[in-house]
Amino acid sequence: NNEAAIIDPLREIQAYIDLAKERNSKIKYIFETHFHADFVSGHIDLAKATGATIVYGPTSMKTGFEALIASDGQEFKLGNATIRLIHTPGHTMESSCYLMIDENGKEQALFTGDTLFIGDVGRPDLAQHVIADLTQEKLAAHLFDSLHNKIMPLHDDLIVYPAHGAGSACGKNMSKETYDTLGNQKRTNYALRESLSKEEFIKELLIGLTPPPSYFPKNVLMNIGG
């Protein structure tokens, strides 16, 4: 019904505006999976240009701009489709995935942000540089729970679209592939092994993490404050 949403928009927004115009569609929502560290988002400028609502998952952080702080499981109508927010803390505390459900009620795609990559999961040591009482161990434990309680129970045919691929500093073992089925990730992603205990997951996730770039915390604060 000529309604569109943008997930995690880049800083340069004109391509989104042009594509929406080309397809005679109105950008209704800007869904952010988390407060990004590796780039400055175009969410504020895109909202000003289109009137779209900026949406984040549950967070205690107060944004410097108007945004809808959604609850876990909250749904948004987009034409005949439904977008359901799934709160998946771990990479950051507000990290959320967006589940796309078609007009027949079938779950079609999961936009996972930095929670689940192809071949990897998000590093759990970034938010601790912004929120003092967080540790990478606590975040890794949250991520384990999010993966096992929120994502892995979803059906295997679901298409996973992460925010990054190989080369990003937000993970350590990302594939060059940009999408995959959830079922294949359950079989091949080291972090989703059923035999992996929470303690083993935390240890394995933290091994080999290099220090994040120094500008990451600055980007987070810019994305929160506007």
Give the positions of each predicted feature.
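Conserved beta-strand hairpin/beta-sheet module of binuclear metal-dependent hydrolase folds
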Residues: 1-26, 98-113, 118-119
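Active-site neighborhood of phospho(di)ester-bond hydrolases with catalytic His/Asp-centered motifs
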Residues: 6-7, 27-36, 55-58, 87-90, ...
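Active-site metal-binding motif and surrounding structural segment of the metallo-beta-lactamase
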Residues: 11-55
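Active-site environment of divalent metal-dependent phosphoester hydrolases
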Residues: 13-14, 35-40, 61-64, 93-94, ...
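Short acidic-hydrophobic, aromatic-tinged amphipathic segments that line or gate anion-handling sites
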Residues: 68-72
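Core dinuclear metal-dependent hydrolase active-site scaffold
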Residues: 75-105, 109-110
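Accessory terminal helices/loops
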Residues: 129-226
